[in-house]
Amino acid sequence: MIYTLYIIATLGVTIFYTLLTQLYIRSRKKHNRLRSQYLRQVSAAVLADSDSLAIAITASSRRERLALADAIYTTASHCYDHNHSITALIAQENNLEKHLLRELRFATKYRQGLLWLQLATISPSHHYTLQLRQELHNSDPHIRSCSLIALLCTSPEESIKTLLELDFELQPYDISRIISLVRRGVLPFAFERLLQSGNYNLKLLAISIVRHFNLDIYTKYIYSLLGNKEHPKLITEVIYTLTTMKHPLNSPLLRRHILAMPPSQRKALCRHLSAEGYSLQALRWLLPNNEMEYAERLITSHKRQLSQSNRAQV
């Protein structure tokens, strides 16, 4: 009897969660259909820079508003120096700011981060700046990261002050998001100020920007950081930046820092150097003899050729 009840209960729970999964999948499909529809409309309005097309975009239900907010965020994330007044007009006509703020109260942690990003993109306002600054101290790294990007979007003129006041170290994901804002023209950084700052986060961001945009004129300054008593992570970023920019490897200072790395980090750097096209002879100068066999296998493997051919296509 007990065994039969156990089987029935198990089947009931299985059926319940199966139904929940099916409902969620159906809901996501509807959301994606609406989002695709709004993406076409928002993109057309932004490209045409047309107020009339923007006003024609309507969202009356909760599902439609969420899909429209997602579409505006996606469009803005892929546009460079676009006219924000068009997306702001769409948001205003559909009262998106009010509805997104209401969604924030009941959202899960992951969803909260996405809603902050959408809110900052759709309607960058100083009304919720204080709340965003409070979220920077959240223990959840996802919410913290999303809140930082949202705050930079809403108050770009205070971006350096915001980064200076952070009580956590920027992670690679944060850096890539900030660089995306720089590329899109959202953040008006005074770049020299970043490089000359004694703040870890600002200097890390500056080094990453040099690498990302291949700013050759700052190579000498970046190399000079190897001679300073910098944070170990900054030294690693400097090495990756110099090698990405094809800096010669025949430097005693560079070799000393690479030999001081833990073997696991040196192995990762070896993969990076191989992908960047450095020769086996150049690596012999940098790596210990017992690690040269691994470097030789990397350089002569087909993976290196695939990596370089993919970069050439991009």
Predicted regions mapped to residue ranges:
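Short inter-helical turns and helix N-cap capping residues of alpha-solenoid HEAT/ARM repeat scaffolds
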Residues: 107-108, 139-141, 167-172, 198-199, ...
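N-terminal topogenic membrane-targeting module
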Residues: 23-108
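Short glycine/proline-enriched turn or capping motifs at secondary-structure junctions
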Residues: 288-296
